[in-house]
């Protein structure tokens, strides 16, 4: 571990002495409303917002932001939609397929910015297939090809309403050892992971067991050294909260075996559940006030043309902001982002310093399979 400790020290020095880092960029964050832990620069046909325009939009309202595309491309199948070119997954029955070029696109967009603007962004790797045992190799390859760029992986999906059934190839699974390899490597490199995994299936029958919860708990407990942000509290357009969801979340957040797991409250579709009633707001606020270090805010806006859309999501949560303690509100909107992503920057830069240009080590066994994959 000597190399790792030395690299951490070097990375810390670079991080805190560079004029472009978060610690030295007080002006953009002075008076900011939030940092965005969940932002898509591009859409399902890989088009979107120019990164320079996005930084301009952020202005003094958004302190920092993640930066990632969509790992899936919506196919334009002429036999299905004719001359209509779908740009969203609900507009066509044609499949979605994994689109790895998104990572190079995000990296080059980030690298086109001056250092002081780069310091406000945390690019994420998404262009991998989580059913592929080589997915972890893709993530490693992106890191070594674009050192100094990425802070984490995600958002990527395992179970997602409407989307999972459209993806070409095998269905992603929480029990797949390919996912274990991904999470293993993210932990090794110090990357933050943003994972979309619905808490339940759409339209469950009365009394139906939410089997996804047990699988999710098991895979998260297998990777205690990997920082995971669970997106949207597991909710969706039609995936509703399960019975006693807040009780289950309380139990999870108090579990030492899950101390590495965080939750983002992002997306306007999530807001509709949290703000559905004064009682829902109060119960959610009580949970966040109890665990203020474990929640982050994100807009989950896709390729906006202005800050109106992200701010609309932020305002959707206003009843929640009003119900939180000032300390909890600050942490959810700003502080927890800085803490998690600053730590990731240091760890990932240290991993890159120790590994870029070096021979790739033999793959390690995954916790679930017990066998590695030959290099």
PLM features: what roles do these ranges have?
Residues 1-8:
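Bacterial N-terminal signal peptides that target proteins for export
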Residues 14-23:
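C-terminal segment of classical bacterial N-terminal signal peptides
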Residues 23-35, 46, 50-65, 289-296, ...:
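Mid-to-C-terminal alpha-helical segments outside catalytic/metal-binding sites
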Residues 24-108:
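An N-terminally biased module of ancient metal coordination in phosphate/nucleic-acid-related enzymes
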Residues 35-39, 64-68, 119-125, 152-154, ...:
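Hydrophobic faces of well-ordered beta-strands that scaffold small-molecule active sites
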Residues 41-50, 72-76, 96-102, 128-136, ...:
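Acidic-and-aromatic substrate-binding clefts and catalytic sites of carbohydrate-active enzymes
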Residues 160, 167-297:
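Catalytic pocket-lining loop regions of alpha/beta-barrel enzymes
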């Amino acid at each position: 571990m000597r190399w790792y400790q030395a690299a951490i020290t070097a990375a810390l020095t670079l991080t805190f002495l560079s004029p472009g880092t978060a610690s030295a960029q007080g002006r953009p964050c002075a008076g900011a409303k939030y940092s965005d832990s969940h932002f898509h620069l591009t859409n399902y046909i890989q088009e979107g917002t120019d990164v320079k325009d996005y930084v301009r939009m952020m202005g003094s309202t958004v302190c920092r932001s993640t930066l990632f595309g969509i790992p899936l491309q919506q196919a334009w199948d002429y036999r299905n939609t004719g001359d209509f070119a779908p740009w969203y997954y609900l507009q066509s029955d044609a499949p979605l397929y994994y689109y790895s070029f998104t990572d190079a696109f995000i990296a080059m967009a980030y690298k086109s910015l001056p250092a002081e603007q780069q310091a406000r962004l945390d690019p994420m790797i998404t262009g991998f297939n989580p059913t592929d045992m080589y997915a972890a190799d893709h993530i490693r390859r992106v890191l070594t090809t674009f050192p100094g760029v990425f802070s984490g992986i995600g958002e990527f999906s395992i179970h997602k309403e409407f989307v999972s059934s459209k993806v070409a190839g095998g269905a992603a699974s929480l029990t797949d050892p390919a996912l274990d390899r991904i999470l293993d490597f993210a932990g090794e490199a110090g990357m933050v992971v943003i994972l979309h995994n619905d808490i339940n299936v759409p339209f469950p029958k009365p009394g139906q067991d939410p089997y996804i919860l047990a699988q999710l708990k098991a895979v998260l407990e297998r990777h205690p050294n990997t920082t995971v942000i669970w997106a949207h509290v597991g909710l969706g357009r039609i995936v509703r909260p399960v019975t006693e969801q807040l009780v289950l979340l309380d139990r999870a957040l108090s579990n030492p075996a899950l101390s590495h797991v965080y939750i983002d409250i992002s997306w306007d579709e999530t807001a509709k559940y949290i703000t559905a009633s004064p009682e829902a707001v109060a119960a959610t606020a009580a949970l966040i006030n109890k665990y203020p270090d474990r929640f982050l805010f994100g807009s989950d806006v896709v390729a906006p043309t202005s800050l109106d859309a992200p701010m609309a999501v932020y305002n959707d949560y206003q009843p929640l902001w009003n119900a939180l303690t000032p300390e909890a509100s600050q942490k959810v909107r700003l502080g927890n982002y800085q803490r998690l992503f600053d730590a990731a920057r240091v760890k990932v830069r240290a991993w890159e310093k120790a590994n870029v240009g070096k021979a790739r080590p033999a793959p390690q066994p995954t916790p679930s399979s017990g066998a590695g994959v030959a290099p």
